[in-house]
UniProtKB/Swiss-Prot annotation:
Protein name, per record: RB1-inducible coiled-coil protein 1
Motif placement: Nuclear localization signal: 565-568
An annotated Gene Ontology molecular function: protein kinase binding
Tissue specificity remark: Expressed abundantly in heart and testis, and moderately in kidney, liver and skeletal muscles. Very low expression levels in lung and spleen. Colocalizes with RB1 in various tissues.
Signal peptide: none
Any one of the GO CC terms: nuclear membrane
Post-translational modification: Phosphorylation at Ser-733 of the FFAT motif activates interaction with MOSPD2.
Phosphothreonine modified-residue sites: T238
Chain's gene name: Rb1cc1
Sites of Phosphoserine modification: 222, 229, 237, 243, 253, 257, 261, 623, 646, 649, 652, 733, 1087, 1366, 1478
Assembly information from the UniProt record: Part of a complex containing ATG13/KIAA0652, ULK1 and RB1CC1. This complex associates with ATG101. Interacts with PTK2/FAK1 and PTK2B/PYK2. Interacts with GABARAP and GABARAPL1. Interacts with ATG16L1; the interaction is required for ULK1 complex-dependent autophagy. Interacts with RNF111, SKI and SMAD7. Interacts with COP1 in the cytoplasm of proliferating cells in response to UV stimulation. Interacts with TP53. Interacts with C9orf72. Interacts with WDR45B. Interacts with ATG13; this interaction is increased in the absence of TMEM39A. Interacts with WIPI2. Interacts with TAX1BP1.
Pfam families attached to this UniProt entry: ATG11 (PF10377)
Amino acid sequence: MKLYVFLVNTGTTLTFDTELTVQTVADLKHAIQSKYKIAIQHQVLVVNGGECMAADRRVCTYSAGTDTNPIFLFNKEMILCDRAPAIPKATFSTENDMEIKVEESLMMPAVFHTVASRTQLAVEMYDVAKKLCSFCEGLVHDEHLQHQGWAAIMANLEDCSNSYQKLLFKFESIYSDYLQSIEDIKLKLTHLGTAVSVMAKIPLLECLTRHSYRECLGRPDSLNEHEGSEKAEMKRSTELVLSPDMPRTTNTSLVTSFHKSMEHVAPDPTGTERGKELRESCQSTVQQEEASVDAKDSDLPFFNVSLLDWINVQDRPNDVESLVRKCFDSMSRLDPKIIQPFMLECHQTIAKLDNQNMKAIKGLEDRLYALDQMIASCSRLVNEQKELAQGFLANQMRAENLKDASVLPDLCLSHANQLMIMLQNHRKLLDIKQKCTTAKQELANNLHVRLKWCCFVMLHADQDGEKLQALLRLVIELLERVRIVEALSTVPQMYCLAVVEVVRRKMFIKHYREWAGALVKDGKQLYEAEKSKRESFGKLFRKSFLRNRLFKGLDSWPSSFCTQKPRKFDCELPDISLKDLQFLQSFCPSEVQPFLRVPLLCDFEPLHQHVLALHNLVKAAQSLDEMSQTITDLLNEQKVSTSQASPQSAASPRIESTTGITTTTSPKTPPPLTVQDTLCPAVCPLEELSPDSIDAHTFDFETISHPNTEQPVHQASIDLDSLAESPESDFMSAVNEFVIEENLSSPNPISDPQSPEMMVESLYSSVINAIDSRRMQDTSTRGNEGFGDRAALHVQLEKCRAAAQDSHSSIQTIKDDLCHFRTFVQKEQCDLANYLKCTAVEIRNIIEKVKCSLEITLKEKHQQELQSLKIEYECKLDALVKDSEENVNKILKLKENLVSLEEALQNKDNEFTSIKHEKDAIVCVQQEKDQKLLEMEKIMHTQHCEIKELKQSREMALEDLKKLHDEKIESLRAEFQCLEQNHLKELEDTLHIRHTQEFEKVMTDHNMSLEKLKKENQQRIDQMLESHASTIQEKEQQLQELKLKVSDLSDMRCKLEVELALKEAETDEIKILLEESRTQQKEMLKSLLEQETENLRTEISKLNQKIHDNNESYQVGLSELRALMTIEKDQCISELISRHEEESNILKAELDNVTSLHRQAYEIEKKLKEQIVELQTRLNSELSALEKQKDEKITQQEEKYEALIQNLEKDKERLVKNHEQDKEHLIQELNFEKNKAVQTALDEFKVERELVEKELLEKVKHLENQIAKTPAFESAREDSSSLVAELQEKLQEEKAKFLEQLEEQEKRKNEEMQNVRTSLIAEQQTNFNTVLTREKMRKENIINDLSDKLKSTMQQQERDKDLIESLSEDRARLLEEKKQLEEEVSKLRTSSFLSSAPVAAAPELYGACAPELPGEPERSVMETADEGRLDSAMETSMMSVQENMLSEEKQRIMLLERTLQLKEEENKRLNQRLMSQSLSSVSSRHSEKIAIRDFQVGDLVLIILDERHDNYVLFTVSPTLYFLHSESLPALDLKPGEGASGASRRPWVLGKVMEKEYCQAKKAQNRFKVPLGTKFYRVKAVSWNKKV
């Protein structure tokens, strides 16, 4: 296992030991520095996902470091270099020598050694292929990792931008709040200045410093025990705070420094007055303080420390002066003049960070996918090399095992073919390697530029982020300091209030402790007395029969209340006395005197009354000791009595006493207690028990518990049961009364008399009444027997009853008060709730009514306005809709024209060279036009100056007239009051009539002008449509002619080999560029059309506004006239007539001047129109000349291309003819040589045969002579017969040998012929390849020229766009000039209107007294009407001029677009011609040529395996697919896709076409793996045999 780090700059993987994963990132950086010499400061380590690795964290905490997910390293030194990092190119030792080795091995003879050397070469080629494939895979893997690294750094950039945006948003929000509160901060600082001056005058009390010093040292407070230590601490505190001589100087220095800091604030244009106020207040405070200090130096005691000195000492060196200085420094740093440009820079950095063109690498994923496909083809080539190498090894093993030399020639020939295939595969692998290396280098170059951008952008963002953080800190610190300032400004008031509060609390504690002591003392006595009484009664009543039956609850105990002293509080208060407060009153300034008032003492009378009441209650409780004495006597009697005495005898007097109770009281309705004589005074109400907001709740009634207490509900009854010694009637009445009270206050009282509980109670009470009545009868019969005992008991009972009545009367009064208050509070609550409900309902009703009324009124107004607006804008909308529809139709037609003419742009190559010269001419024309425009501007400037002078003179005259007029009005105002009303009524009527007439005239004129404009626009649109239709017809005719030419050229199609298919990629790139240019042109057209429509809309809105302004101006004039009529009065007729005549003459002269100015402006407009028309005619003529030149150049280029095409066709025909002639000549030579060789062999064989026959005849003759000579003829005959037989056998053997030799010679000749044929074929192929390469080079040059021309056309298009932009700029200038003229005309119109207003006013004012001058106001009205008509005419003329300009500019743009479209079409056609030329070879089909287009039956085709479709297809350069029929697979010895893998299937085979059928995919899932609806051919073919 290793740790993988990927260097993104160069795309290399760095490996390290896994021990570094346990160590920190800093150790990893040191390891990278030591191993790869990359400095630590230049290293940036990023994990997938964008997280940057921290130096102090361990490497293993990040989920990265594997080979698939490495740590991405960025070298900043490489990024900041100007040159991109170079990718190292790896070359293997044998990859370049393979071709030489193959050529050498092909030259070797057919021997075993050649077989072994070729197998070794094949194995070497396979090894090299494996290395190349692994190298290419590594390169592509590195590119994938580079892509991942770029994605990681982009994620990091995204995180940085998000954090930067959050920081900026936070700062903007805080800074906006700060800007809103600047004035508040300045006000707080001024308050602090006044507070500082006050604090300097307030002396610090000595006891306060002792207290704080004691708190610092942590010593306990002991005010009475440690007086000596307090004195020592006081001395130390005075030494620590300040010496007695220092405070004056420090105070003055502080105030002066505060003043200086106020002066040194950054000057704010809005807050200068506030700064002056601050300075004045500071100076006044300094002067006052110096005077006060000088006056009071003699009166100050020894401990002379002010409150300001103590505050300054608390946090040295941060005193008040430094606090204020820091506040003003930070405010000057946060000046909007400094911050706002910085904020703009921050927003610009955010925009730079969000640059999508730099973030996204367009087309990289498609490129990586293509590289993956290339790697897959590379692996296929390696597998093919492997199979071939294994075949070589197998053939070598067979040859070694057979050891037959006759097999070697065929084996060597097949080896040669296989070596050529391996060499081709090797070349392909080298090509793939080259492509991969170039792709990696290009990606590295691209990433270098983008990483440099990323580095600079992030650096800028970091710098701005640091500034933002510093500014944010500054704002936060400033706001915190302002809070401190706010707190310090309230210190004098708080100091005085705290001193007063301490004095008040001291006074209160004194009285409160006295009252609490007396209360606790009396409470203890009362509680102990009650406790002893209950204990004695409990001992007596414990064994009674009535204990748990009739008298329940007698075992309860009273709760302990006011038996303990309250806890200590306010122990740590400083020792401030009234003397100290008076001292402060005498020395503190007047600003603080309202806060230093002596607190008023509480009203302690209720406390004294409460103490007296408690004393009386204790006396009353102690006065009942006779009852307790009787109880003790009874207890003693029980002890003395005998054991025979029953418990009933002891309880008999109690039972007898109860009879009285039952007779007098009823259980259902107990009567209230009536106390006649009270032994103790009335108890105060509960509100008076506590003084000054200290009520009875200070003591917790429930917390002091008793061991025998029950729940809180029962404790109230227990308190009432404490009166058990009282007579039983009173006791029962009190209990019943309490129960009723509880039932009233309880949430669920039992009030139903028919409920089961009430029925049981009634039954129980009836039974008790019956028993009591029976007892009364018994006692009446026995009354005489115990009369003496009754008398004594009766006396005692009366005493007890009196005491019980006293106690119950006090309780009854308390309960009555409580009940009264409870009912009062409940009534108040109910009344309040009802009142709130009623008021809420009333308010809601009012709000709803107001809402309804407002909604109704608003709806009515809105509907009226909507109706008026609908009526006004319906006609405008109809016109605009018509225009928009016409524009949409035009756009659609333009789009159709664009689509139809897109093919012509590719063929316009040399046209734009002439446009340069034309552009120069246009530039000259533009310069001349600019000069003329400058001259016109100068003239306009001079005229404008003259108009200003005239206006000034007119204004002076008007001011003089107004002064005279005002004087006369003041003198004659009192005389003409009686005539005012009649004259005003008549004038109002006449003015109303005239206004209506003038308004109707203006409206009619406006409608007429609008109708004229509509008619003119419609005529122009019709003319445009007619011209557009004629141009479309002409273009359609041209298109038809061009289509005929294309059809003529498309008939000349021929064949070409497989290698030309690689040029399609270049054409695709050109198509992409063309599509981009088309889209840009479309966008330009859309934008121009939208701009024109918007301009038209704005002009229409301007016209409406002008009409509305005119109406408003007329209305304003009428209102002014009415106001003047109401203010002014009739004056002397004779003087006014004379003055009026003079003023009218002056005004006529001014009006003449204004009309002359109007005429001059109209003449200037005419001149401008003429110049515009001239410029338009010039531009039209120049454009027509440009079009003519373009047409001429197009025809010349077409002629050139036709000539080139003819020359190419002639060259091809010559080549084909020469090739055929060479081939025939070679075949003839081969036949001739073959015949010659056969004849020579036969001749030699005949000669040899004759020689052998001659030799045999001579031998026979010689043998016959020998036989004849010898005597033993018979023996010789036998020998001769044996010799003849032997000779015959020899002859036969020799014949056989000769025949074998002949056969061998024939075989050799045949092999030689085959070798000659193969060599001829190879020569033919090489010649054909050379011709092809030449043709290819020529066509590549043509394509390059075309691409260069296309680039030039694109450049020229850009220049045309610039020209269009310049024309649009000229148009904008003209529009601006027009606007300026309109503004001047409007100014002149307003001035004329203002001048005509007083002229019309004067005669109308005095019309009642001067009937001889009725025509003067009518003249002024007519003049204003004439001026309005002139303005409307001028506006209509300007509108027509503007529309003419817009239409002419539209025509120019349309002409340029059409020329561009024609160029695109011609470019496309020329590209198609070039493609057809490059794909055409020989028109006549030859049997031994491979067809690559337009397959027919009998054509020789190349059948290849297409892995995308998993089928065999015919190799073609056309877009249509030709699939091989599945029935033809066995005939061609091919395997189907289902039965064999891609490695074992043959990659290609040659065949002949037998059948062809046209098909279409009807299912999405099909065996050819094509999309639904795809059209293709299915072809049947047979194997091609060269011999056949």
